[in-house]
């Protein structure tokens, strides 16, 4: 199964401690300061999980983890984690990014593609990092595969 908005929202109810204005936020999914952005991100995951968007928004991964929570996630990951190996891969990944951006109109400052694109880009150049610090390169690879 591909990650849905509900799975994403549930994942935020994991006991994390969030503070706002000196107070503890009991549930970021319902708190007035966060609930709208939680709903906006959930909408992105709902879009990717629609059967008609499966190929546009996700790609098959070989390690069975999908980058989104384990084998139960159907061994697919969002294209934001895809490492392009050809011009066609790059164009396909861009189409997925455009589709998500059109959903939020560019007004979601830190959409899930933000960090994933940074991590994926660094992962593609990990040989440069490895030349300076093999342990950091291995940590990056572990993070990407997670």
Outline where the language-model segments fall.
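Acidic/polar, glycine-rich intrinsically disordered N-terminal extensions of enzymes
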Residues: 1-67
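Glycine-rich flavin
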Residues: 59-146
